[in-house]
């Protein structure tokens, strides 16, 4: 069996430098050179997964086809690689310890004392190897920053794994910050030198250094970093702030990043075909048209909470050669504002998903305004559920209509807690209000059957069914379906009796879906629901 080659990506100085984007960019170049590539994110935090973490704490939770709740970097990986990943592509310290403790309880360690070395480190190595099976190259991003206590077992694992597979089968890339000091008017390399020194103390010497910076690094500065950090001069790569993250692979390519990678990993001459990517990036940066839509959500102070959705909108804009300007609307503040004033300058209204009652009435207000004023509307997940609540209250005149998530005692729960459903493996799942929150939602890709000649069918190019990803605990109550449809709110998507999509038959574009279309959108393959909504907003603007 052919040996998988590994590229380990670590970060220094501080977090949020963009290790995920750098890793995804390198993966894109390698894939477009004809190699089979995958990426793994190893997160040192002790949560089993990010599923129960606050969006303000950790940003978006990205969901894979197989229902894994993962780090938002997996979204970047999928969007750059244009491939679906799985739960094998993300794990945490919590998951590792959980697995080791379960094995110990089953007696698999034959009574031995369980220690970080070899047991925890061995589990990390096994998970890395599993993710790389059948691939030419696996890129492994280690979350956090070198020097974090939580990250030490992961760094020890990649140090040991490199020795195990041999020098031509693994390399280390270290991403670091080269800050620009305005008072001095110059870039400083000392944080990079200290970060590499910290990495070396752990036993890892980087083969390549990627320097994040506000400004370009001149040749002398790159040479200084190379000499002080012990890497070849062509292995110091700059990663300057860019207008779009999708420029990064092209920027790396201009610096010939693949030549030293090919040399270190003993690969053939790598020549990626990036023509299509390049043309799409040009349309992202300098589109011909412009349209403004309102993005209504409760986490708008932290845009990372909606990362996949904002990226999907960029993809749609590139496909339609249009810059989509987002007007961020805090749904909680909207409750005390005039809808007409807030939405007077937009050509579409998007109501995003979320959890909890805060901001719900503001979202309902936005939906009512879109419905009554015939402005293109897209509701996603909670956005669909609240479209049902709004319609029930204002059209069916069920004034107490609500979701049982927000009012367990309401007389007209048009959205309710589903207690039984089949999961992605075809197994029956049972839920109650007291079921633990972690990993217990309806998660992953499910088939949605589409009503013929509907708006949903139109956006999916008359497909009879599609598979889209879900992350929710509450469902539309089928008891109210007949009344909804009698008054013009049509069910256009279903999954084994569960309502997946609704639309208004007397509106230019009013579509609400229970699934998350943004999770399957890619730069080179935009999701049809997002694209259809942006196209409707453009038509509204033109007319």
Swiss-Prot record:
Entry's Gene Ontology BP terms: 'de novo' CTP biosynthetic process; pyrimidine nucleobase biosynthetic process
Pfam families named among the record's database cross-references: CTP_synth_N, GATase
GO molecular function: ATP binding; CTP synthase activity; glutaminase activity; identical protein binding; metal ion binding
Taxonomy, superkingdom: Bacteria
Reactions mediated catalytically: UTP + L-glutamine + ATP + H2O = CTP + L-glutamate + ADP + phosphate + 2 H(+); L-glutamine + H2O = L-glutamate + NH4(+); UTP + NH4(+) + ATP = CTP + ADP + phosphate + 2 H(+)
Enzyme Commission code(s) on record: 6.3.4.2
Keywords from the named record: ATP-binding, Glutamine amidotransferase, Ligase, Magnesium, Metal-binding, Nucleotide-binding, Pyrimidine biosynthesis
Listed pathway(s): Pyrimidine metabolism; CTP biosynthesis via de novo pathway; CTP from UDP: step 2/2
Regulation: Allosterically activated by GTP, when glutamine is the substrate; GTP has no effect on the reaction when ammonia is the substrate. The allosteric effector GTP functions by stabilizing the protein conformation that binds the tetrahedral intermediate(s) formed during glutamine hydrolysis. Inhibited by the product CTP, via allosteric rather than competitive inhibition.
SUPFAM superfamilies registered for this protein in UniProt: Class I glutamine amidotransferase-like, P-loop containing nucleoside triphosphate hydrolases
InterPro entries: Class_I_gatase-like, CTP_synthase, CTP_synthase_N, GATASE, GATase1_CTP_Synthase, P-loop_NTPase
Other comments on record: CTPSs have evolved a hybrid strategy for distinguishing between UTP and CTP. The overlapping regions of the product feedback inhibitory and substrate sites recognize a common feature in both compounds, the triphosphate moiety. To differentiate isosteric substrate and product pyrimidine rings, an additional pocket far from the expected kinase/ligase catalytic site, specifically recognizes the cytosine and ribose portions of the product inhibitor.
Subunit structure: Homotetramer.
Family: Belongs to the CTP synthase family.
Function of the molecule: Catalyzes the ATP-dependent amination of UTP to CTP with either L-glutamine or ammonia as the source of nitrogen. Regulates intracellular CTP levels through interactions with the four ribonucleotide triphosphates.
Protein name: CTP synthase
Species of origin: Campylobacter jejuni subsp. jejuni serotype O:6 (strain 81116 / NCTC 11828)
């Amino acid at each position: 069996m052919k040996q998988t080659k590994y590229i380990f990506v670590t970060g220094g100085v501080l977090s949020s430098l963009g290790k995920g984007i750098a890793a995804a960019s390198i993966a894109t170049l390698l894939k477009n050179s004809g190699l089979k590539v995958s990426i793994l994110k190893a997160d040192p935090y002790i949560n089993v997964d990010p599923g129960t973490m606050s969006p303000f704490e950790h940003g978006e939770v990205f969901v894979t086809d197989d229902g894994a709740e993962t780090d938002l970097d997996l979204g970047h990986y999928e969007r750059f690689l244009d491939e679906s990943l799985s739960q094998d592509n993300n794990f945490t310290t919590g998951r590792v310890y959980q697995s080791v403790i379960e094995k110990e309880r089953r007696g698999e360690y034959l009574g031995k004392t369980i220690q970080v070395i070899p047991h925890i480190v061995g589990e990390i190595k096994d998970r890395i190897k599993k993710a790389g099976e059948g691939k030419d190259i696996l890129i492994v991003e280690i979350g956090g920053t070198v020097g974090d206590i939580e990250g030490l077992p992961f760094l020890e694992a990649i140090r040991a794994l490199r020795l195990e597979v041999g020098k031509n089968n693994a390399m280390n890339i270290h991403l670091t910050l080269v800050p620009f000091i305005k008072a001095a008017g110059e870039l400083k390399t000392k944080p990079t030198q200290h970060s590499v020194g910290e990495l070396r103390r752990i036993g890892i010497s980087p083969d390549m250094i990627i320097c994040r910076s506000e400004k370009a690094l001149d040749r002398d500065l790159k040479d200084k970093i190379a000499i002080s950090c012990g890497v070849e001069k062509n292995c110091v790569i700059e990663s300057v702030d860019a207008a779009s993250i999708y420029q990064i692979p092209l920027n790396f390519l201009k610096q010939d990043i693949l030549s030293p990678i090919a040399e270190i990993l003993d690969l053939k001459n790598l020549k990626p075909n990036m023509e299509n990517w390049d043309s799409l990036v040009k349309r992202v940066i300098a589109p011909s048209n412009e349209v403004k839509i309102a993005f209504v959500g409760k986490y708008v102070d932290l845009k990372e909470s909606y990362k996949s959705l904002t990226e999907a909108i960029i993809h749609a804009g590139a496909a339609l050669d249009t810059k989509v300007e987002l007007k961020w609307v805090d749904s909680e503040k909207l409750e005390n504002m005039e809808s007409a004033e807030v939405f007077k300058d937009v050509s579409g209204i998007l109501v995003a998903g979320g959890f909890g009652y805060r901001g719900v009435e503001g979202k309902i207000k936005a939906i009512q305004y879109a419905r009554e004023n015939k402005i293109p509307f897209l509701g996603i997940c909670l956005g669909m559920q609240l479209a049902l609540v709004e319609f029930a209250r204002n059209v069916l005149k069920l004034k107490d209509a609500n979701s049982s998530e927000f009012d367990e005692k309401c007389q007209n729960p048009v959205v309710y807690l589903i207690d039984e459903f089949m999961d992605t493996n075809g197994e029956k799942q049972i839920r109650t209000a007291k079921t633990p929150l972690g990993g217990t939602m309806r998660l992953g890709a499910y088939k949605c059957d589409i009503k013929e000649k509907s708006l949903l069918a139109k956006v999916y190019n008359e497909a009879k069914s599609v598979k889209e990803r879900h992350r929710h605990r509450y469902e539309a109550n089928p008891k109210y379906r007949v009344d909804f449809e009698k008054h013009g709110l049509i069910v256009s998507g279903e999954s084994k009796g569960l309502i997946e999509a609704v639309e208004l038959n007397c509106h230019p574009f009013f579509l609400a879906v229970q699934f998350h279309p943004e999770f399957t959108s890619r730069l080179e393959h935009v999701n049809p629901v997002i694209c259809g909504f942006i196209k409707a907003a453009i038509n509204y603007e033109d007319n």
